[in-house]
Amino acid sequence: GHVPCGKDRRKCGYHADCCNCCLSGICKPSTSWTGCSTSTFLLTR
């Protein structure tokens, strides 16, 4: 239920972890990125 997080390939959990997952499926390091959110779209625990 996790996806790689950017270059360091750490795992993404919920938004409190290292990154957020955008609807495009790309992991971004911050909620401030355009198109990103703290939703659980790709964060199924």
UniProtKB/Swiss-Prot annotation:
Keywords: D-amino acid, Disulfide bond, Ion channel impairing toxin, Neurotoxin, Secreted, Toxin, Voltage-gated sodium channel impairing toxin. Disulfide bonds join C5-C19, C12-C22, C18-C27, C21-C36. It is found in: Secreted. Expressed by the venom duct. Residues 45 form a propeptide. It comes from the Eukaryota. The modification D-leucine is found at L43. One of its GO terms (cellular component) is extracellular region. The keyword Disulfide bond applies. InterPro entries: Conotoxin-I_CS, Toxin_19. One of its GO terms (molecular function) is sodium channel regulator activity. The cysteine framework is XI (C-C-CC-CC-C-C). Belongs to the conotoxin I1 superfamily. Iota-conotoxins bind to voltage-gated sodium channels (Nav) and act as agonists by shifting the voltage-dependence of activation to more hyperpolarized levels. Produces general excitatory symptoms. This is Iota-conotoxin-like R11.12.
